[in-house]
């Protein structure tokens, strides 16, 4: 009996010494191009955090709930992608991940805290950076779009538009296209993407047909449409996107998130 007690006690100490099992990564869509990624270790990333966009009925509640954010990613300097970034950064201390020129413009023209926009979190297209002690790796990729930043004195240069391939340790590889048209170098990401978050709204970005062609080039595990329906001009629809995917036999790849939905990656 005494021997069993000793073995049981030793087992308890061993279990206590083991690291806690990490939770699965999660992806939340706030509408438009705004997403939250939670890593298995609980780090919080926001991409193009316009939480208060018109398609989000719970914007006020969602903003209030963002009390812990580690990194804010911005694809370019347009207002519908900067969104609530400055407010969230000031509240949470989140650091800005963006190209060098966009970082500087955010500090100079939008009041983003300079101490939270440092060289460790910046790069340029083709460059890769490791963040959060290796928990997140980021590849900066180009996009085809405008990228000026609005100020009281008119638009200013804020770097070139882009996207991100965000690789989460023990989690998904997420390609956020930013605002873009289809371009041939997308094919270089083939086989490297689990979740593709891609614009389908048309007029200012690729529409459903060209977005489907982008999916055919990359072949992600899931294709999640975004940047549609926020304004009347963004007329592309998920239904049209799915129809266009059907031409390639890829309609099964589409996953349509609802605003406020959280997808768990297993």
From Swiss-Prot:
Keywords: Hydrolase. It comes from the Bacteria. One of its GO terms (molecular function) is hydrolase activity. Belongs to the UPF0173 family. This is UPF0173 metal-dependent hydrolase Glov_0171.
């Amino acid at each position: 009996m005494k021997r069993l007690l000793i073995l049981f006690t030793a087992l308890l100490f061993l279990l206590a010494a083991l690291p806690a099992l990490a939770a699965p990564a999660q992806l939340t869509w706030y509408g438009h191009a705004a997403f939250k990624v939670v890593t298995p270790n609980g780090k919080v990333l926001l991409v193009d955090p316009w939480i208060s966009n018109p398609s989000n009925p719970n914007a006020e509640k969602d903003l209030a709930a963002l009390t812990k954010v580690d990194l804010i990613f911005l694809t370019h300097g347009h207002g519908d992608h900067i969104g609530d970034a400055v407010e969230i950064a000031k509240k949470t201390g989140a650091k800005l991940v963006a190209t060098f020129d966009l970082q500087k413009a955010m500090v100079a023209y939008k009041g983003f805290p300079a101490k939270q926009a440092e060289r460790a979190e910046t790069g340029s297209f083709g460059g890769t950076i490791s963040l959060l002690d290796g928990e997140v790796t980021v590849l900066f990729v180009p996009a085809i779009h405008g990228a000026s930043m609005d100020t009281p004195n008119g638009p200013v240069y804020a770097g070139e538009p882009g996207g991100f391939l965000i690789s989460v340790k023990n989690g998904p590889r997420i390609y956020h296209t930013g605002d873009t048209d289809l371009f041939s170098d997308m094919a270089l990401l083939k086989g490297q993407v689990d979740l593709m978050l891609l614009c389908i709204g048309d007029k200012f970005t690729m529409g459903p047909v060209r977005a489907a062609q982008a999916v055919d080039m990359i072949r992600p595990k899931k294709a999640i449409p975004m940047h549609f329906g926020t304004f009347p001009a963004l007329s592309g629809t998920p239904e049209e996107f799915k129809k266009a995917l059907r031409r390639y036999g890829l309609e099964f790849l589409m996953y349509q998130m609802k605003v406020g939905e959280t997808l768990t990656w297993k």
